[in-house]
Amino acid sequence: MYIEMMYPVFIMMVIFIVGIFVFATTLQRYHSAGEKTDIRNYNDYGEPAKSLYTSRYLFSFHKDIDVTDENDNVVYHSSSKLFSFTNETTITDVQDRVVATIERKLFSLHLIHYIDIVGGTSFELSKDLFRFLDMKFTIDELGWTLQGDFTNLNFVLYNNQERVIAVVGQKLLSMRDKYCIDLYDVNEEATVVAIVITLENMLMARRNANRSSSHTHNSNM
């Protein structure tokens, strides 16, 4: 009797999970190195000038991330200090030259992160990006707009003339948090890479905080 009562609930749960997966698939614009550009990217924006791929180390105290090209060569690497209140992160190129630095502002409710591009500009990102159902965010210092699904990092980046700079897509069902960056303006490569790595670290911190909160809640029950 109990099994018969629970069967419809089980079916509804399966339908719900499949629905979420299908919805996430419609937002995903990821493609692996060597694969053709996502057909939606191609139809909407044409062939990108180049594609880059980020991959987070599975077990790393320094939150290491490699950024590789279409031939799987590492072109950038990011690493965070192990003991740092500001979560200081450095991005270096293949010649170990610093490309950008990222720091979190202390005592900020919005978890503001400052990004400095070497030889370029400085700007900030905040956790306001991850508001529920908020699909658009402007980086005031750059005049750029991010539009899409920030909670899973599937978004399009536009400049102040509404031209596409890059399209970022997350790989579904990956333990290493892999992302594809289709670049349409290679002159902004370092800035785009810094934005994606900052958002990756912010998203991971958000997930860890949610897990910690959930664990604490369960322990108190």
Segments the model singles out, each with a brief description of its role:
Residues 78-79, 101-105:
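Tandem-repeat architecture and repeat-register "anchor" residues
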Residues 4-10, 15, 19-88, 94-97, ...:
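Low-complexity or membrane-interfacial segments used for flexible interactions
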